[in-house]
Each structure stands twice: as C-alpha cells, then as structure tokens.
C-alpha cells in the first residue's frame, strides 16, 4: 500500500489577524509547518508528500522543509488554490501514479500526534475513507443557518435576535479532525463531482460522503486542535513547549534513516531606544499602538508612538538592517502621521521577506504618565497583532523625578527584540 500525504498550508489565516499565512506563523521558535513536519518524525513510514502553499511562498516553504528535514527529496511544494477544496484538488495531481492511498492534513493542526497518522494509515488497509473525530464537550444549539451567520457577525457578547433554537444531544455529535484518509480513486472522483456541481464542502469527508457512505471513524486526539484564532496561539505555545521538553522528539524522516535532531535556531537580539517630548496639540496621545484620550500628544513626524518606534528599531537592529530612520526616513510624506502599527507591520513584512521571524519583544517604558499598567495587556495584544502573534512584554518605570523624563517632559522606551532566521 503506497501512501501519500497532502499537507494543506495555503490558508491565509484571516481570523488569526496575521500578516503572514497561517502555516508560517511562529510558535515557540518554529513555524507551524515546521512543527507539523517535526511531529511526523516518529512515523518511520515511507510517505510521498505534497505541500500546498499560498502564491509566492514556495521558496519560503522550501527553506522551512530544508531546515526541518535537511532535504527536499520526496517533497513537492506547489501553489495552492483560493479555497481549501481547490488546494486539495490541485495537490492530488502531483502524487506519482503508484500512490493508492492519500492522507489530507491541515498544517493548522500542527501538533497532531504521530499515532493518529499511523491509525489512519492502518485503517486504510480495510477502509475506503477514515476520519479521526473527537467528542464535543459543549452543549449544542441549532439555529437557522442564515440567522447564525448574521448573529455571529455581531461580535462577542452581543445578544442573538433569533429565537429559533433547537437543543441537541451532544452525545450524538463529534468534531472531525485531520489527517483524513481516502482511497485515491475515491477522493479524485469526489473532487471531479464537486467541480462539476460547483459545490463547496467544509472538508474532504463531507465531499466524499456524497458518493461513499461507508466512512470509518476513529478516535482523534486533543492535541490535534486547529490554530484558527489568536487565542489558539497560546495553546500552541504550550504544545510547543511540551514537545521541546521531550528528548525523544526527532525531526521528520520520510524515507531515509533518522537525521540529527532538529535544533532551535540561535536567536538574534536587537535593542531599540526612543524618546519623544510632549507637545500642546489637540490630537490624542498614541502609545503602544493604542490611542490615549485626554493625554498630551508626543511630538513626531509620525504619530509619535515611542513604544512602537523603539520596537521597530530593535527588530531592525536584530536583523542588521539599520534603524527606523534609515529604513523609513525621518521626514518622508509617506510616513506623515503614520501609526505605530504601520511601522511594526511594515517591519514584520520586511523581516519575513528576508527569512526572519519575530520571537518576542520586551519593552520598558519610562514615563510619569499615562499609567501603562491600566492598559498593559491591551497594549501587548495590539503590538503582538502587528507581529504575527509574537510574544510581547511591557513594563514601566519612572525616574523618581530625575531628568527631563522625571519632570514629565516626555516619554522614553527601551525595547529588546529576539528574532531568528529560518
């Protein structure tokens, strides 16, 4: 039985609020796709692998694979489609003719344990379709589909207007996970049908079920959660830390003897310092990517966000790319009143283009006012959102009345950033 593995990494991660596609978001020093490859290391099973990535990210993915595997042999990295279903349809074309069974896996489920892959492969010996599922722990409520889309769009905490609610027994329902396994011929036939009917399905099991009702279910795993929203990154960080603490985790080996253990890349460290004085202006203060009403604005060609500027210089310094002034200029029309988020997001893209990823930034704010502790967590999240979910730590201190900062003439910030090169 010749098995192929299709890794879907073409999702843009819009709900993750990341400037990078989801597969290339850093968690614990590695991108999600690298964790996915790392977790496959214990399979010891010969697999032919195809990876679908967004347009323009083939080269970056190749670097990820080389760092994880040391080789591109048996790996094909191709550009995916506009939807998950399109990416699957494109990806299955790249497997060699000898492949008779296919596993389809979302890279967003980067921490799926090896035993789940092995269980799916084992069941494919006697089944045409195999789906890992996990019990639902929450109570289930059913509403009209159009009502659901409208109500969810209203945002967290907002009351539903619809009253058409059915209360379902959760014991009858399970959540589907990946990898999902299929006979190759069955999956290809299901895709041909979906193209002909112009239908879109939530996943491959739903699509295959249109022509094959006999689908085998196996128990999935809690670690096979899907990274979808920013809060999922905290869970992913915990999973990454757990894996790094295990000495028996080795890099993925698809068809060759084990290679040396994947080591964490050495961090590159940069320091950024910035100061701005207060001015009399009707505009509000901008600090740490937040607007602070009823506080004096900081002077600057841009919005004067001293925290964002210090972080930007720290990141550029770590990458040996200069500082905020040398990269963005000091008086360009394009950066007039530019926000701190603009500088951080632009720097994040610049780093990513050059193969860097942000690990974390620690920032010390020096000022008498405003009181940063009141909005510290909010500010950390705002900066993190600009940097693909990187960890941010903000703290503040005064000078006990000494110097121009002690006299309340302005605000200073010192930032230390850690990045790594893929």
Swiss-Prot record:
Instruction: Please indicate which residues carry the site annotation Transition state stabilizer.
Output: 15, 22, 301, 398
The segments labelled 2-C-methyl-D-erythritol 2,4-cyclodiphosphate synthase in the record are 268-422
Q: Which reaction does it catalyse?
A: 2-C-methyl-D-erythritol 4-phosphate + CTP + H(+) = 4-CDP-2-C-methyl-D-erythritol + diphosphate; 4-CDP-2-C-methyl-D-erythritol 2-phosphate = 2-C-methyl-D-erythritol 2,4-cyclic diphosphate + CMP
Which keywords does UniProt give here?
A: Isoprene biosynthesis, Lyase, Metal-binding, Multifunctional enzyme, Nucleotidyltransferase, Transferase
- The answer to whether the entry has keyword Nucleotidyltransferase is yes
Q: Pathway, according to UniProt?
A: Isoprenoid biosynthesis; isopentenyl diphosphate biosynthesis via DXP pathway; isopentenyl diphosphate from 1-deoxy-D-xylulose 5-phosphate: step 2/6; Isoprenoid biosynthesis; isopentenyl diphosphate biosynthesis via DXP pathway; isopentenyl diphosphate from 1-deoxy-D-xylulose 5-phosphate: step 4/6
State the EC number(s).
2.7.7.60, 4.6.1.12
Which amino acids does the record list as binding a divalent metal cation? 274, 276, 309
What residues does 4-CDP-2-C-methyl-D-erythritol 2-phosphate bind to? 274-276, 301-302, 323-325, 404, 407
InterPro entries, per database record: IspD/F (IPR026596), IspD/TarI (IPR034683), IspD/TarI_cytidylyltransf_bact (IPR050088), MECDP_synthase (IPR003526), MECDP_synthase_CS (IPR020555), MECDP_synthase_sf (IPR036571), Nucleotide-diphossugar_trans (IPR029044)
Site feature: Positions MEP for the nucleophilic attack: 170, 226
- Single GO molecular function: metal ion binding
State its cofactor: a divalent metal cation
**Region 2-C-methyl-D-erythritol 4-phosphate cytidylyltransferase: which residues?**
1-267
Gene Ontology BP terms: isopentenyl diphosphate biosynthetic process, methylerythritol 4-phosphate pathway; terpenoid biosynthetic process
HAMAP family from the UniProt entry: IspDF, IspF
According to its UniProt entry, the function of this protein is described as:
Bifunctional enzyme that catalyzes the formation of 4-diphosphocytidyl-2-C-methyl-D-erythritol from CTP and 2-C-methyl-D-erythritol 4-phosphate (MEP) (IspD), and catalyzes the conversion of 4-diphosphocytidyl-2-C-methyl-D-erythritol 2-phosphate (CDP-ME2P) to 2-C-methyl-D-erythritol 2,4-cyclodiphosphate (ME-CPP) with a corresponding release of cytidine 5-monophosphate (CMP) (IspF).
The record's similarity note reads: In the N-terminal section; belongs to the IspD/TarI cytidylyltransferase family. IspD subfamily. In the C-terminal section; belongs to the IspF family.
Q: What is this protein called?
A: Bifunctional enzyme IspD/IspF
Organism the protein comes from: Tropheryma whipplei (strain Twist) (Whipple's bacillus)
Underlying gene: ispDF
């Amino acid at each position: 039985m010749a098995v192929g593995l299709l890794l879907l990494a073409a999702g843009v991660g819009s709900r993750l609020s990341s400037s990078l596609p989801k597969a290339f978001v850093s968690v614990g020093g590695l991108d999600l796709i690298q964790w996915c490859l790392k977790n496959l290391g214990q399979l010891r099973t010969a697999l032919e692998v195809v990876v679908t990535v967004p347009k323009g990210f083939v080269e970056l993915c190749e670097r990820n694979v080389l760092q994880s595997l040391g080789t591109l042999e048996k790996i094909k990295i191709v550009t995916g489609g506009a939807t998950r279903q399109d990416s699957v349809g494109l990806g299955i074309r790249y497997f060699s003719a000898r492949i008779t069974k296919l596993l389809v896996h979302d890279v967003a489920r980067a921490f799926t344990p090896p035993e789940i892959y092995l269980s799916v492969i084992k069941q494919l010996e006697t089944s045409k379709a195999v789906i890992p599922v996990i019990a639902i722990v929450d109570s289930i409520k059913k509403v009209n589909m159009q009502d659901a889309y409208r109500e969810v769009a209203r945002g967290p905490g907002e009351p539903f207007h619809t009253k058409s609610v059915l209360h379902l027994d959760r014991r009858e329902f399970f959540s589907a996970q990946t990898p999902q396994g299929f006979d190759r011929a069955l999956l290809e036939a299901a895709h041909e049908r979906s193209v002909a009917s112009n239908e879109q399905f939530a996943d491959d099991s739903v699509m295959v079920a249109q022509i094959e009702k006999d689908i085998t279910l196996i128990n999935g795993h809690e670690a096979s959660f899907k990274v979808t929203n920013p809060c999922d990154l905290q869970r992913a960080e915990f999973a990454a830390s757990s894996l790094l603490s295990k000495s028996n985790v080795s890099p993925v080996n698809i068809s060759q003897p084990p290679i040396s253990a994947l080591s964490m890349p050495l961090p590159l460290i940069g320091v950024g310092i910035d100061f701005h004085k207060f001015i009399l202006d009707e505009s509000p203060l901008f600090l740490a990517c937040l607007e602070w009403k009823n506080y004096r604005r900081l002077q600057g060609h841009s919005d004067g966000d001293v925290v964002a500027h210090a972080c930007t210089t720290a990141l550029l310094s770590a990458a040996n790319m200069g500082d905020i002034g040398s990269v963005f200029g000091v008086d360009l029309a394009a950066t007039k009143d530019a926000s701190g988020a603009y500088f951080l997001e632009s720097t994040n893209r610049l780093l990513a283009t050059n193969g860097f990823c942000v690990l974390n930034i620690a920032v010390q704010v020096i000022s008498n006012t405003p009181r940063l502790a009141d909005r510290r967590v909010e500010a950390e999240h705002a900066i993190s959102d600009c940097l693909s979910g990187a960890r941010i730590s903000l703290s503040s201190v005064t000078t006990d009345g000494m110097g121009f900062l002690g006299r309340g003439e302005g605000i200073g910030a010192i930032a230390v950033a850690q990045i790594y090169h893929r």
